Amino acid sequence: MDQLEHLSLVSKVLSEVENHFGVVEKDVAEFVIHLAQENPTFDKLKKALDSQGLGDQFDDSLTATILRIVQSMTAVKKKNKKGGDSKEDIKDSHKITLISDAKEEIKARLPALAMANTAKEKEDNEDDLMAQLEKMEGRYESEKRLQKESDSKRNRSRSRSRSRDRKRRRSRSGDRDRRRRSRSREDRRDRDRRDRDRDRDRGRGDRRGDDRQRDRRDRRDDGGARKSEVAEIGKIYDGRVNSIQSFGAFITLEGFRQKQEGLVHISQIRNERVQTVADVLKRGENVKVKVNKIENGKISLSMKEVDQNSGEDLNPRETDLNPDAIGVRPRTPPASTSSWMNPEASGVGQGPSTSIGGGKARVRISTPERWELRQMQGAGVLTATDMPDFDEEMGVLRNYDDESDGEDIEIELVEDEPDFLRGYGKGGAEIEPVKVVKNPDGSLAQAALMQGALSKERKETKIQAQRERDMDTQKGFSSNARILDPMSGNQSTAWSADESKDRNNKMKEMPEWLKHVTAGGKATYGRRTNLSMVEQRESLPIFALKKNLMEAMIDNQILVVVGETGSGKTTQMTQYAIEAGLGRRGKIGCTQPRRVAAMSVAKRVAEEYGCKLGTDVGYTIRFEDCTSQDTIIKYMTDGMLLRECLIDPDLSGYSLIMLDEAHERTIHTDVLFGLLKAAARKRPELKLIITSATLDSVKFSEYFLEAPIFTIPGRTFPVEILYTREPESDYLEAAHITVMQIHLTEPPGDVLVFLTGQEEIDTSCEVLYERMKSMGPDVPELIILPVYGALPSEMQTRIFDPAPAGKRKVVIATNIAETSLTIDGIFYVVDPGFVKQKIYNPKSGMDSLVVTPISQAAAKQRSGRAGRTGPGKCYRLYTERAFRDEMLPTPVPEIQRTNLASTLLQLKAMGINNLIDFDFMDAPPLDSMITALNTLHTLSALDGDGLLTKLGRRMAEFPLEPSLSKLLIMSVDLGCSEEVLTIVAMLNVQNIFYRPKEKQDHADQKKAKFHQPEGDHLTLLAVYNSWKNHHFSQPWCFENFIQVRSMKRAQDIRKQLLGIMDRHKLLMVSCGRDVSRVQKAICSGFFRNAAKRDPQEGYRTLTDGQNVYIHPSSACFQQQPEWVVYHELVMTTKEYMREVTAIDPKWLVEFAPSFFKIGDSTKLSTFKRNQKIDPLFDKYADANAWRITRVKKRIYNPNK
């Protein structure tokens, strides 16, 4: 029986081998079965085959298939021997079906996520720099040689060949290197992109022998003796004059397998005017020509752009862009750029738009006019050069039949998937967003949806009320209509005085409730105390455990510290580490999840340490570095420490790293967990401290190698939990009622309300203020204090001030008050049970903020805020059943619900390709990683094998999202890096324009001066350039309703990015008036955000067919271009596109060939297939009135 089962196994394996190799070898099958039995996992079997020299012949799919057959047959054999069918046997059999380990199974299915890690070496950067220097040297030598040849042209003899030979013998090695570099650029275009980096050295070595046998000058352009298939645009070829015509000459190109013939127009022969072609060229004459254009198989050539003696290109231009050509080609900027730099001076904003296609603008000719022109041309009245559509650059008439404005072009998504994803590339676009709600049909989820509708309704009500106020204002101004008259001398003084008054007030119109909160702008901010700095430090709960904590730091490499918010962990532990002597070998680093926290904490610690901020104590956030060489305590965002790991994975400059607020589980913190854990293994002297304010410290301890837990006891008092009896549909209104109820009926004590964002907080402050105002002076005063990220930090500090006697304070905050802030005097907490979370939508490819229910852990943390000062109450505006059944135990980590493209790009840049084995605390979903890898591949950051390209390596160096990084790098090749650098800096700053309510029309008029017809990105560029031309003036910003702080922030960001570009030798080049280059660069980075105008209304995105709209404030709102790309989507009353730019649809295929393709004109496109065709009808009648069933039938009445 065993022999029969073995023969059956051999037969199955033999059939697989025969199908794969076409050879029947029983010995090979038995040998492979033996290896599979000895090596039961995929990796082990693969290594065994490699050791036997069979790894190249047995691919992954064949290896996995053989392993599955052997293990399944072996499991059946064992089961038959035992004769039982127990649950354990079935379980074991199920486990061994393919691969025993779950990770091994994932590796077998997705090898792209389990590629071997590569060590990050400095030689890569050195090779890149050397390659750039070699290119620069080659250009310099070429220019120098051309200058010498032109100087000695008159004295040169006929024996040019011998002189070249003598010169070649004198500098043979130098020319050989230049020859090899020149040809390597040509060969790299022909090689497969995936193999370029791996085969670079091998290809150079193979070509070394060929270089010795070739003449450099004669064969530089055609790549040696190899015959080409087709001509390429921009290349120079040798040719022979075949025939001469009155309008030009036909040239037969040499060096091709098949005959290639092109036309040199009479205008392209010489720079000066040529009367007769026969006077300049003769039949059979050898010439050098450059390919200018190839259209419908016809080749347009030029002789005037080529040196007929040396074959040098006299007018070099860019060919098709290679995604990896990120470089260093210099470009001569246009002579005049002043009008574009200052749109106010020349009225660029109101001028005609630059043609999208670049080059010569298209001339519109009607059909009758074209017929008349052709008749006149046939009669000999007009020549070809007199035609209005004659292209002087190409020397031919433009074929307008093949051109369009994008209306007839259909762009479709490429269905092909990258090779390294092997059948999983399409799945990434089909997955649904990550579920962060336990019960989507529960009362909490329904309340969140209802609040979204109510929020939209509130916004529309405010807009309508504002319009009514504007109408009343205009009616009031009817008697003083001359106030806006520029010719009115009497009113100009009053108007300028009014403007200066606005400037003094910073044009901020405070709502009445906000004026009451800030005491009319005269309130004093800051937490007042009479204690000295030493007494304040000693009053913290952590001070009592100082000695024990310092001993724990010294004795343990990794330490988990748990303490309540306000115990002093963030400010004191770094100073304790210095006192314990841990700062002698390196800096003390502390990460913060928020930029504001890193800045404020560093400022506080510098005051306690007795130094100036930026010296011994400093901070680093994105685009701002406030440290020096003497800094020993450094606070930073977790993202900045992750970028430092990109340069130094071992963090050799640090002796202690403290991950503060680790319980928030941001995406950067989760990645740092794995990186710091690996760094601690390599560096035993590196200390790690993980702090948490919640009770999940056991999970951190288990992850960090059973690290000891140090607990700082806090002051906690009992808290009474109160639930609602029925679910609340409008939790915002329920919160208002609860606050009023507490204020009117409960004993003294402050109130803390948790809401989701600024809009809800402002609305609540306004509603509570109006309700308290309506109750009259007899009711005790309620001090309303908002807290959210956009609020000025000096105003946020007022929440710490105790309420005066006889008054109650209500603090309305986001979830920042859960763990990051400790407010004394809070006895009552109102918890609606919601929070805004960033969730990635794979269909749109973007992150969006969604209101979701909180977790049970967050609910407990919120209720604990009421028990810091004394016994308190927590009013939960949801049912107890909802808490138990509709809330997750812990929040979903950010790494499992957001876009991973930027994170995976940084891991790839660190050499971490094996994402399956990376030590995540909570691994992200496989679908999310597949989607991120697919996104990076479409951005050309990854090649066909899933490895990082040179472009991807450069993208990882910029502290930007991948699309912005590619946009910035590609602008160098497109010759517009000066402009794109400014645009990227402005995109990283929000709220550039200010729109005061009482002068909205005036602000809109000022903003319209900067509008560019190409779109909002170029409008931002015009704003910055105008500010620059006015010497970065602050009064100029006030006059034009522009935020000064935002502009200065954009200026700082631009300086930071400029330093990075200089470090990577990326040239700063201006495009001048040719703004189509800027549009192309924007398209190359944001092609995924392309949208086409919908015949019904608005636009439809190309990726998921979603209905989106251009915002009325956009520069493109009036033009409504056919094709646009946008920066991001903003959901208000509609899905509005933010920062829109018009594009040519052909650019999508040009810059994203792996993502878009031109649709088949013979088939119905996906875009049109999704469109709805509505029948025509009378707009004054019912929509279905035209149907025959709706027509009233006349009944014949014989009595009439």
Curated annotation (Swiss-Prot):
Its EC number is 3.6.4.13. Keywords: ATP-binding, Developmental protein, Helicase, Hydrolase, mRNA processing, mRNA splicing, Nucleotide-binding, Nucleus. GO terms for molecular function: ATP binding; ATP hydrolysis activity; RNA binding; RNA helicase activity. The keyword Nucleus applies. GO terms for biological process: developmental growth; embryonic body morphogenesis; feminization of hermaphroditic germ-line; germ cell development; mRNA splicing, via spliceosome. It is an enzyme of class 3 (hydrolase). Could act late in the splicing of pre-mRNA and mediate the release of the spliced mRNA from spliceosomes. A motif (DEAH box) lies at residues 660-663. Residues 234-304 form the S1 motif domain. Residues 138-154, 184-228 have a biased composition (Basic and acidic residues). Pfam families: DEAD (PF00270), HA2_C (PF21010), HA2_N (PF04408), Helicase_C (PF00271), OB_NTP_bind (PF07717), S1 (PF00575). Residues 138-228, 305-360, 480-504 are annotated as: Disordered. GO terms for cellular component: catalytic step 2 spliceosome. It catalyses: ATP + H2O = ADP + phosphate + H(+). It comes from Caenorhabditis elegans. ATP binds at G563, E564, T565, G566, S567, G568, K569, T570. Residues 550-713 form the Helicase ATP-binding domain. Belongs to the DEAD box helicase family. DEAH subfamily. DDX8/PRP22 sub-subfamily. PANTHER family: ATP-DEPENDENT RNA HELICASE, ATP-DEPENDENT RNA HELICASE DHX8. This is Probable pre-mRNA-splicing factor ATP-dependent RNA helicase mog-5. It is found in: Nucleus. Gene3D superfamilies: 1.20.120.1080, Nucleic acid-binding proteins, P-loop containing nucleotide triphosphate hydrolases.
